[in-house]
Structures are given as structure tokens and as C-alpha cells.
A protein has these predicted regions:
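Alpha-helical transmembrane segments of integral membrane proteins, especially early/N-terminal helices
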Residues: 31-45
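A generic membrane alpha-helix/interface feature
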Residues: 38-41, 114, 200, 226
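PAS/LOV and related PAS-like sensory modules
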Residues: 224-231
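Interfacial "cap-and-anchor" motif at the non-cytosolic start of specific transmembrane alpha-helices
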Residues: 33, 46-222
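First transmembrane helix
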Residues: 2-30, 131-154
Length: 231
């Protein structure tokens, strides 16, 4: 079972690496494409979390050293705490809103103390304190889903695509939290959800870029028609 789990994990990590490099290249070629920048960060965070969880599963039967376990658990917690605000940052760029960006800043401020706790506190104290972060994570998920639903109802293009991806991610994150605390479930579901989220949101960025290029091309052709009419 562990070998099969590692195959799924390796597949997701490979997918994340390829898509992250692709969107990083898009951002480097066009620095105004902040959606690709945020999505690259998201891919890296999910990749780090998947990698650390799979490594902890590998080390578990062999009783890892305190240093290895401490490093893995800290990195895993950090990726989890940064993921929520990063998703909000991505959504706020793809579907701009002043009010939602304020919520995104508040999410980073609320997550900052927990990020510091994950870096500096002991593992035992950290595990107890960080349980309260689930409430903050739930608020981040709920606010994002409500905002994307609002965008969809207002007719924002591709908002429903973004909502579907975030719903899948929310299900994966919720399952991950329960699974990590000993509730019955399968680690595969989290991997599936993360993979679907990455593919859906990557499609969203590609669809938005294609739509923008079509609008530019249409404007160019309209201008050519006007010039021909004046000649």
C-alpha cells in the first residue's frame, strides 16, 4: 500500500513541478502576469506538503531521528499555513476586488504568528497551539468560496471554474486535516484533490489568457476595418 501511495505521490509531485516551472516561465516573460506568479507559489506549497508527508510515511517504520522528524513536520506545517493566504492571493489577482484583497492581507496577518510558531517553538508546543489555526483556515476557505460564488453570480468569466477548483481543494484540505488526526480515510483523496485543483486552475489561467488574446485580435481587426473604410 505504501508503494502505491508513493507512486501517486511521485506522480503529483512531477505534475506540480512541471506546471510550476511553466507558470514561472510565463511570469518571468511577462512580469504583469501576477496570476501565474501566485499559482507558481501555490504549486510549490502543495509540492512541499506532498513531499514532506510522503517522506514522513517512508520514515515512520524506521523511527526517524528527532532532527529529521522536526524538520519535516515544521516544513509541512509551514506549507499548510501559507496555502490559505496564497490561494486568496491567487483568487484576488485573477478576480480582482479591493475588499477581497483586504481580506487576503488579513489572512496573511492572521497566519504570520503561526508561521513564527512553526519556526521557533518546540514540536510538542507547536502541535498544541496550531490546532487553533484550523478555525482560521476554515474562515479563509469559506470567504474564498463565498467570494467566487458572488463572482459567478455577477457573471465574471470563468468564476465557476475557479469555484470548482477551490471546492475540490477545500475538500482535500479538510480530508487532510481529519486524516492527519487519526480519523478514518484515505491519503489518496488528498492527492487526487490537489491534482484536480492544479489542473483546473491551470486551465483557468490558460482560458483567461486565450480570451484576452482573442479580445486583442478582435480589436486589431476592428481597427483595420476602420482604416480600410476611411481609405
Amino acid at each position: 500500500a505504501l508503494t502505491v501511495r508513493n507512486l501517486f505521490s511521485a506522480g503529483l509531485i512531477g505534475l506540480l513541478l512541471v506546471i510550476a516551472l511553466y507558470h514561472l516561465a510565463r511570469y518571468l516573460m511577462r512580469r504583469t502576469d501576477l496570476g501565474s506568479a501566485w499559482f507558481t507559489l501555490l504549486c510549490v506549497l502543495v509540492l512541499v506538503r506532498e513531499f514532506t508527508l510522503s517522506r514522513m510515511a517512508d520514515y515512520y517504520p524506521y523511527v526517524p531521528t528527532d532532527e529529521i522528524f522536526s524538520f519535516l513536520i515544521r516544513v509541512e506545517f509551514l506549507s499548510f499555513q501559507m496555502a490559505g493566504p496564497a490561494v486568496m492571493g491567487f483568487v484576488g489577482v485573477v478576480f480582482p476586488s479591493v475588499r477581497y484583497r483586504v481580506l487576503t492581507r488579513l489572512a496573511w496577518l492572521a497566519s504570520a504568528p503561526y508561521i513564527l510558531i512553526s519556526i521557533f517553538m518546540s514540536i510538542q508546543a507547536m502541535s498544541i497551539v496550531l490546532k487553533s489555526y484550523y478555525l482560521i483556515m476554515a474562515a479563509q476557505i469559506l470567504s474564498t468560496l463565498v467570494y467566487l460564488t458572488y463572482c459567478g453570480l455577477r457573471g465574471r468569466k470563468y468564476a465557476w471554474v475557479g469555484l470548482f477548483g477551490c471546492v475540490v481543494l477545500a475538500l482535500g484540505a479538510t480530508h487532510d486535516m481529519f486524516f492527519a488526526h487519526g480519523f478514518q480515510g484515505s491519503g489518496y483523496w488528498t492527492t487526487y484533490c490537489f491534482g484536480v485543483f492544479v489542473l483546473v486552475e491551470s486551465y483557468l489561467l490558460a482560458a483567461q489568457s486565450t480570451h484576452a488574446f482573442k479580445q486583442v485580435e478582435k480589436s486589431r481587426l476592428d481597427n483595420l476595418e476602420k482604416i480600410k473604410a476611411q481609405m
